[in-house]
A protein has these predicted regions:
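C-terminal outer-membrane beta-barrel translocator/porin domains of Gram-negative envelope proteins
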Residues: 114, 118, 202-206, 347-533, ...
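Gram-negative/organellar outer-membrane beta-barrel architecture
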Residues: 11-14, 25-28, 125-126, 145-404, ...
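Interaction-mediating elements
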Residues: 1-158, 167, 180
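Solvent-exposed coil/turn segments that connect beta secondary-structure elements
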Residues: 3-9, 59, 77-83, 95, ...
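Strand-connecting loop/turn motifs
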Residues: 51, 192, 224-226, 309, ...
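Membrane-embedded beta-strand positions of outer-membrane beta-barrel proteins
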Residues: 197-199, 229-233, 312-314, 405-409, ...
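C-terminal beta-signal and terminal closure region of outer-membrane beta-barrel proteins
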Residues: 487-495, 556-627
Length: 627
């Protein structure tokens, strides 16, 4: 049997109301690990309900093994010698915030606000009081809660503007009956500007090689509200090995300007108001607790403050593909990210507008698009007004076998088409324009999951599954090129070069100078990789990949490409081995992929249908793990 005895009325009530969470139960095997786990659980429960000085050692156990041989009669009791400060709940008092700049200037300024006092260098507070109120999850008069302490530290560090930060709690005075903790926050601002320069190299299966360069400049706390303004400039240049003509050279240039705010700026959502409503519930419960000696409702301590960001970005991209086309993309995006708990992230792109335009084509490219209308539609000049939502869930950091799951839902053009419908135009009518350009209309959904089975510190099996579909309708018959799916490459089916598989059983004899990629509306893919440590920081891998893409609408120019039961059996399969050099912050990866089964007709029967073994080899250089 298990009995909880000797606790005061408040603690006893808390333990009784959390009976279903107890880790010690009658009939289970007796173990010291279970006792330690229960001590930790009780500590968390008490510290979330005001007992700031409570520690695991203040819970003791008395075991009687004589009364019933083979069984243990267990009593859980508070330690008799625990200090007086650990025997009562503590309440939050005043919050003192000391802000230092990166130069450690003298503190000369002071600002008093209800519940808060700020000390800072100069005459103007470097970080507005509203940011501190949203980040510090304590309120004067409420009971101390460990979750609020943890959330405060996470919020402040999450702002990304401090080089050092500390949160401490101290009794207001030294009297015996003191039950008030003042909060002392000390923070040092980091340097306001950050700059980064990244260099990369590319070698593609079509023998294109070249360097890439990216430069980003960021200003933190730009408007004294922990905002970040960032400007990024990037470019790359590629040339064809063995070719002497400059017409075979390609390049890409792009730039992005973004404004990031450390809160959710939504007209219909006010996290501050939510916090006020929550605080009012706390205040009412506090009054009852003090007058009637009742504990606070436990659900109040399940509250998770909304921690989110708002980002507004403007971008432009210029792509020149030698001998084929020049493609320009400009756009803007309003993005929200927030966490409902540390393992669940939500991302909402409430407004995303892209304009795609092919400003130059060659006769060779025009002849290809005339023979392939679907390619022409996917790359024509068009506006893409879209809304998307992404949900990501991860396993706890303590899980032995970690997992990662992500779902995406995206739609484009439906709001615009709905406005047209209000003027009498059919929702499914084609030929509608926005800003004198046709707009794309589609819906897209994807699901992806990763799971790693850890056998030992040196051996694990990583697995990945992906499924996606994009369907164009209404004003479009083909989804934009950038929204379609592809298979092959360093992070896909590694036995085949990037974008060379599918759709379905279709296969084109493209040359090494071709930029016509194989894409589809539906994608299924699965990967498995056995990872082992060879020696030092060098790891090895043995992998198996499978997948393909298909078209929803039949395309006469690409036979065997449609989504049918027969074509679903057309799956590309590849295997191979790889090396990974782990530099902690950077993983350099080399994979040698071997194609086992091509989904198209190669003229050879059987599962292994690659004509020549040399043709099945693909070498990939990459940064980071494939999944």
């Amino acid at each position: 049997s298990v009995a909880y005895k000797g606790f005061d009325a408040t603690a006893d009530s808390l333990l009784s109301r959390t009976r279903k969470h107890r880790l010690l139960r009658s009939g289970e095997a007796f173990s010291t690990s279970a006792l330690v786990a229960e001590q930790t659980r009780i500590e968390a429960l008490m510290r979330n309900n005001g007992y700031y000085y409570f520690s695991p050692t203040y819970t003791t156990f008395f075991a009687d093994t004589v009364a019933h041989p083979g069984y243990v009669q267990l009593q859980v009791r508070p330690a008799a010698q625990r200090p007086a400060v650990a025997q009562r709940p503590w309440y939050i008092g005043h919050v003192y915030v000391t802000i230092r700049d990166e130069n450690e200037s003298n503190i000369t300024g002071r600002l008093d606000r209800p519940g808060y006092t700020y000390f800072f260098p100069g005459t103007q507070i470097p970080l507005q009081p509203g940011v501190w109120r949203r980040s510090i999850q304590h309120m004067e008069g409420e009971r101390f809660a460990a979750w609020a302490q943890k959330a405060t530290v996470e919020h402040l560090y999450g702002l990304g503007i401090f080089s050092a930060m500390d949160v401490n709690y101290a009794p207001r005075d030294s009297s015996f009956n003191c039950d008030t903790l003042d909060v002392h926050v000390s923070a040092t601002l980091a340097k306001p500007y950050d700059a980064s320069l990244e260099m990369s190299g590319t070698y593609k299966s079509n023998e294109q090689i070249g360097p890439g360069l990216s430069y980003e400049l960021s200003k933190h706390n730009a408007f004294r509200g922990a905002e970040t303004v960032a400007w990024k400039l990037f470019g790359s240049y590629e040339w064809q090995l063995g070719a002497s003509s400059s017409a075979l050279n390609s390049y890409e240039l792009g730039s992005q300007l973004s404004f990031k705010f450390p809160r959710l700026i939504m007209p219909w959502f006010n996290p501050t108001a939510m916090g006020r409503r929550y605080r009012r519930r706390i205040a009412i419960a506090l009054t009852r607790a003090k007058l009637l000696g009742q504990p606070l409702p436990l659900q109040l301590y399940d509250y998770t403050p909304v921690n989110g960001t708002t980002t507004l970005a403007l971008s432009g991209n210029w792509r020149n593909r030698s001998g084929f086309f020049t493609f320009v993309t400009v756009g803007g995006n309003l993005n929200y990210k927030w966490y409902t708990n540390p393992r669940k992230r939500h991302e909402l792109n409430l407004f995303n507008l892209e304009y795609n335009s092919v400003i130059r084509t060659t006769a060779a490219f025009d002849s290809i698009t005339r023979a392939n209308p679907a390619l022409y539609i996917s790359m024509r000049d068009q506006l893409v007004p879209s809304i998307s939502y992404i949900f990501t869930s991860t396993s706890p950091a303590t899980d032995r076998h970690p997992y990662w799951v992500q779902f995406l839902l995206k739609e484009a053009g439906n709001v615009t088409s709905g406005l047209y419908a209000m003027t009498g135009r059919s929702f499914s009518e084609t030929g509608k324009h926005l800003l004198r350009s046709p707009f794309s209309q589609f819906v897209k959904a994807t699901a992806e999951g990763h799971y790693t089975r850890v056998f030992s510190p040196r051996l694990s099996l990583a697995m990945r599954a992906f499924a996606g579909v994009v369907y164009a309708y209404g004003n479009s018959t083909q989804a934009p090129y950038g929204e379609q799916f592809f298979v092959g490459g360093a992070n896909s089916v590694r036995g085949f070069a990037v974008r060379t598989i599918g759709p379905g059983g279709y296969h084109t004899q493209r040359t090494k100078y071709s930029y016509i990629d194989q894409t589809g509306d539906v994608k299924l893919e699965a990967n498995a990789e056995l990872r082992t440590c060879l020696f030092g920081q060098l790891n090895g891998a043995l992998f198996l990949d499978a997948g393909n893409v298909w078209l929803i609408r039949p395309d006469a120019n690409r036979p065997e490409s449609g989504l049918t039961l027969r074509n679903l059996k057309r799956i590309a399969v590849g295997t191979g081995v790889g090396l990974r050099y782990d530099l902690s912050l950077l993983v350099i990866r080399v994979d040698l992929g071997v194609g086992l089964h091509a989904p198209y007709d190669t003229g050879r029967q059987g599962f292994y249908n690659i004509n020549r073994f040399k043709e099945s080899l693909v070498l990939h250089f990459a940064i980071g793990y494939p999944f």
